[in-house]
Amino acid sequence: MFETCEAIVMRTVDYGETNKIVTLFTREWGKVAAMARGAKKPSSRLSAVTQPLSYGHYVIRRSRGVGVLHQGELIDSMRALREDLFAAAYAVYIVELTDKSTEEQKRNPYLFELLLQTLQYMSEGRDLEILTFIYEMKMLAVLGIPPVLDRCARCGATEGRFSFSVKEAGFLCHRCEASDPHRFPLSSASVRLLRLFFHIDLARLGSISVKESTKMELGAVLSAYYDEYAGLSLKTKRFLQQIGELKDKLSPDGGQGASFSL
């Protein structure tokens, strides 16, 4: 029986001379794989709808293994993402993070909406790094490894200066920071943003300014935390870091900061 779903194309793998196996992240069923027969042919009606990052409605015959993709209708091709090297790198990274963090056919409409909203914001030209930080923070809850952000992870203090400890899985107050010599010093802006990114409703984004030094603090904390607790091997992570370095060199503002809607 064929069924219709709303989905984002996560990735494709060539199968034979003309076919593709397409992995879709669906609102209705979670992650599913389907055979798209003839999709490698430029003239195929499945060629455009199976491009990575595409968002649309898909008609699938599901099975326990690989189903069959019968047809699709694009809602948003996300062409702007695929045509921009920087945007594509960040978009493919959050898609791979989602892929590696989810099981087959485990429905999660919250995560579907989060991924879709993030990709749409990226496509609109919003700050790629900040959107990625927000997504990474929210994925920590999905992975079951949320850090302690509302208090000191050791003594429970809620006031004062904080640093971030990967070992303690959260903030350390100034009285407890000596317990971790490898802690990450944080500006007050980074402390606020880590909390904000974890809790904010992505649909309510408006406007803030984030200094490059603050971005560097946030990126260092998140990279170290994921390396320690997530257990994920992401091929796109290193490429994303290289892209970030290239973007800094090409930035007309010299990496002084960026404005972003919040």
UniProtKB/Swiss-Prot annotation:
Per UniProt, which keywords does this protein have? Answer: DNA damage, DNA recombination, DNA repair
Record-linked InterPro entries: ARFGAP/RecO, DNA_rep/recomb_RecO_N, NA-bd_OB-fold, RecO, RecO_C
- Report the record's Gene Ontology biological process terms: DNA recombination; double-strand break repair
Output the Gene3D superfamilies linked to this UniProt entry.
Nucleic acid-binding proteins, Recombination protein O, C-terminal domain
GO CC annotations on file: bacterial nucleoid
Alphabetized Pfam families for the sequence? RecO_C, RecO_N
Q: What functional role does this protein have? A: Involved in DNA repair and RecF pathway recombination.
Which family does the record claim for this protein?
Belongs to the RecO family.
Q: Which protein, by its recorded name, is this?
A: DNA repair protein RecO
Q: Which organism is it from?
A: Geobacillus kaustophilus (strain HTA426)
